[in-house]
Amino acid sequence: MALRSLTLLCAAAGASAGAIELTPDNFDELVLKSGKAAFIKFLAPWUGHCKKMKPDWDSLASTFEDSKKVLIADVDCTTGGKPLCEKYGVRGYPTIKYFNPPDEEGEDYKGGRSLDELKKFAENELGPGCSVDLMDNCSEEQKGKLKEYIDMAPEKRTEMLETLKKELADAESTHEALLKELQATYKESMDKLEKLKEESAPKIKLLKAATPAPKAEGAKDEV
């Protein structure tokens, strides 16, 4: 198992000059089963923002290269990583997600994207989270909730999980629909504004030309 992990790491590292490149072939091994937290940038090589961010992201990867707690990685959504981008709902580039064990769903990173901000987040927020095997990482409130969920019937626990996931998915869908509606309204308003500018500009120019300039104080009319 250790040899397999080392092989996967070497192969992945060779595919990227900085961060390790993830694909469906190594994602489970390096992220979900590694016990590490993962900080992952989903990208497209042609994306301007991705190119701009690459030096800082690669520097971040170098900083955590030997870390036993945090993995810094890339997923190329245009090649072998495309199935992962689809699985985790990536719709724009770059999208940054983080996985704190035992979380397998991933969370969207919404912080700043400078090297200092990324490094601070990785140092302070990433690491193994609260779980049955890591009770020392749990707050008293988390321990109470965890016990409640452990004592719950498996069917009830599954039902509760699916309900929460559906509520979240429905909320995201509603948000996206509203966003599309707002974008359409914005475009319609912008089109009207541009048309008005186009129609008004020549009239305004002629009206200004037809309006005599104000006389300077003390000036006399020429005879």
Swiss-Prot record:
Compositionally biased intervals (Low complexity): 203-216
Family: Belongs to the protein disulfide isomerase family.
Subcellular location: Endoplasmic reticulum lumen
This protein's name: Protein disulfide-isomerase-like protein EhSep2
Coiled-coil regions listed: 155-201
Signal peptide residue numbers: 1-17
Gene that produces this protein: SEP2
Gene3D superfamilies from the UniProt entry: Glutaredoxin (3.40.30.10)
Sequence motif Prevents secretion from ER, residues: 220-223
Highest classification ranks of the organism: Eukaryota, Haptista, Haptophyta, Prymnesiophyceae, Isochrysidales
Entry annotated with the keyword Endoplasmic reticulum: yes
Keywords of this entry: Coiled coil, Endoplasmic reticulum, Selenocysteine, Signal
